[in-house]
Amino acid sequence: MGDIICCLDESGSTEGEAAAWGKAVTMTLLEIAAESRRSFALIHFAGGSSCQVDIFRPGEYTLEDKLTASETFLGGGTNFERPIREALRLMDTEGFEKADVVFITDGECELPDACRQELQAAQAAYHFTVTGILLDKGQADTDFSLKPFCRKIYQTNSLFDTNITSLIDAYR
């Protein structure tokens, strides 16, 4: 298993329960990365150029660093392109070339075709996957925005059954 890059939607539409689910999944993935001594990058994103990156290298961060990351909430609109480009930058320049990407969002956006094609080219070069976690609040058919670029999509409204186990096991 390689490192993990987690793109977390912190747009205004995720405020409340969806944001709590997103943070819970993110912090669980961080713990899994820590247990197996893998690096973890958290890309907080919202609209426009709003993006913040927290990098957690094994043994190089504190509980305070984790708390600060978990308390961050950007607010605003949603832009999928910015976090995808940031994930690709981390692969190119920060030693995350063997990382898989987890994309957590409520799905209220779409990835432009040019960016999707760039992502597909990078996937062919680096052999990574993108897993989507949809903060769906029980709404039907909200995975349309993740289908074009995510290999597998988990929905928070179904994480109470065995799907949560398969999600966690996929990154152990």
Language model segments and positions:
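Mature extracellular/periplasmic domains of secretome proteins
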Residues: Q117-A125
